[in-house]
Amino acid sequence: MKMSLFGAAAVLFASTSAFAADVYQPEPAPFIDAPEVTVSEASGWYLRGDLGYSFNDLRGAEYFQGSNSNLVDFGSAKLKNGYTVGAGVGYQMNNYLRGDLTFDYMTKSDFRGSTNGECGAGPVACTSSDYSSLTAYTLMANAYVDLGTYGYFTPYVGGGLGGSYVKWKNLNNTACPDAGGACDDTVTHGGRGNWRFAYQLMAGASVDLTCNVKADVGYRFRHTLAGGMFGYAENGGPGRDKGFYSHEIHAGARYSFGGCDQPVYTPEPEPLVYK
C-alpha cells in the first residue's frame, strides 16, 4: 500500500513538471527605444529672385513754357522698354495665402519726345526734339492667393502696394525751325529723381523643382504715378511725366526654408523566441 502511494505521488510530480515545461513562457526581450528623429516641417519663410522684361507705356509729359502759368503738353512722349531684376523675402501662411516684400530695379529706359514752340531771332515756329532716360527702383508689399496645386503646378493671383524711386537723366532739348534752317543750340535740363506711389497686379504659376525650390513664371502689371522729370533752363521748364504703365513678363525661383520632410525611422520588430 505504501509503495502504491509513493508511485502515485511520483507520477503526479512528473505530470506537473511536464505541464509546467509545456506552459513556460520566455522572458520578453528587452525593449530597445528607437532613436528620436525630428520631422522637419516647412517654416513658411522663403527667398525669391526674378528676372524680367518690362514693356513700358508713358502716359505723357508736360512742362512750363515761357512762364509758370503756361503748362504745355509734349507733342509726343515715348518710353522704351527695359529689363528688370528683383529679389524678396516672403512667408507662406497656409496652402492658399502668402505674402512677400520685394525690391526691383528697372534698367535704363530711353525717352524720346517732342515739343512745339518758337525759336530763333524771328522768332519762328519750331519743333524741339527731346532725349532723356530713366531708371526705377521699386519697393512693394505683396499678397498672393495660390489657387490649388495640380501635379507640380500651382497657379496664383496677387496684388501689391508700394513706391518707386524714378530717376530721370538730364533732358537734352534741340529746337529746329519747321520751315528748315539752322537749329538752336541744344539746351540741357537737369534730371529729377523722386519717390512715387505705385501699385501692381500679378498672375502666374509656380512649378515644383524639388521639395523646397519652385520655379516661378508670371505676368505683372504696374502703374507708377506722375512725378518730376526735369528742371528749368533757358525759359523752359520745369517738366513732369504723367506716370507710366509697365507690362512685365518675369521668371525666377523661390527657395523655402525647411521645406523637406525627413522620413520617420521605424525599427524592425524583434524576432519571437520560442522554447
Predicted regions and their residues:
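Outer-membrane beta-barrel architecture
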Residues: 40-48, 82-86, 96-98, 136-140, ...
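Predominantly the C-terminal beta-signal and adjacent terminal strand-loop region
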Residues: 108, 210-275
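Outer-membrane beta-barrel channels and translocator barrels
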Residues: 42, 94, 148-153, 208-210, ...
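N-terminal signal peptide c-region/cleavage motif recognized by signal peptidases
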Residues: 15-16
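Sec-dependent signal peptide recognition
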Residues: 2-8
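Extracellular/periplasm-exposed beta-strand and loop segments of Gram-negative cell-envelope proteins
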Residues: 56-80, 104-138, 164-196, 224-248
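Outer-membrane beta-barrel biogenesis signature
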Residues: 19-47, 60, 258-275
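Residues on the lipid-exposed face of transmembrane beta-strands in outer-membrane beta-barrel proteins
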Residues: 49-53, 87-91, 101-103, 141-145, ...
